């Protein structure tokens, strides 16, 4: 279990940021293959210190190394991300570092500092934990869709945690597992209420079904 990140002023938390074209939800499972030296160093530091890091969606720019001051360094991030805890790791034969991270709490970026190698360090503020919420009959279709997704062999390998009785858990896992564009997933992540997220998911699932 990871220890608590270092707390700064006004309850802000300091953590390294991993910008990706992927959205991580609380409780979600994220396998990663790490090859860039800056992120290899970051992950090894996190494992050594039992620290967490932040996953934030790239609004624009590249995941690939663009050091500060380099031409084309136009990286821009969304402000809301998710704290990630490393729950497994391995060293592949090709030298790549493989990890499995699990989403914990949502946060908002207050400020960032970019190192010379392009690694982002951020001061973040945790967002209030969402209410668990209750499911109703109108959510029955969404629960069925989620159950079907959980039977997929690739998803079973990830073994995501889900409580099919909780609105928050169902909304997070559906948003996580449905094949949606990253920006749509980001909009779902930024919602503060499970019922609001479930309502939007009902609309999206309805579009899938024509």
Please identify what each model-predicted range represents.
Residues 194-195, 207:
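A short structural micro-motif
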Residues 163-180:
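Core structural elements
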Residues 1-160, 169, 183, 187, ...:
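Positively charged
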Residues 187-188, 195:
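Charged low-complexity "KEKE/polyampholyte" interaction tracts
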């Amino acid at each position: 279990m990871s220890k608590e990140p270092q707390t700064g002023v006004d309850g802000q938390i300091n953590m390294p940021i991993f910008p990706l074209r992927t959205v991580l939800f609380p409780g979600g499972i994220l396998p990663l293959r790490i090859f860039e030296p800056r992120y290899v160093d970051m992950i090894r530091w996190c494992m050594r210190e039992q620290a967490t890091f932040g996953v934030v969606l790239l609004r624009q720019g590249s995941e690939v190394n663009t050091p500060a001051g380099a031409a084309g360094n136009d990286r821009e991030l969304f402000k809301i991300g998710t704290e990630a805890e490393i729950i497994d790791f391995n060293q592949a034969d090709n030298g790549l570092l493989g990890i499995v991270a699990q989403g914990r709490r949502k946060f908002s970026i207050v400020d960032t500092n970019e190192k010379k190698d392009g690694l982002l360090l951020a001061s973040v503020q945790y967002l209030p934990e969402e209410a668990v919420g209750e499911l109703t009959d109108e959510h029955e279709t969404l629960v069925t869709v989620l159950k079907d997704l959980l039977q997929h062999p690739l998803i079973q390998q990830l073994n995501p945690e889900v409580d099919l009785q909780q609105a928050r858990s169902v909304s997070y896992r559906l948003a996580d597992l449905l094949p949606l564009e990253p920006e749509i997933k980001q909009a779902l992540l930024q919602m503060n209420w499970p019922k609001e997220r479930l309502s939007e998911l009902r609309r999206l699932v309805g579009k899938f079904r024509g």
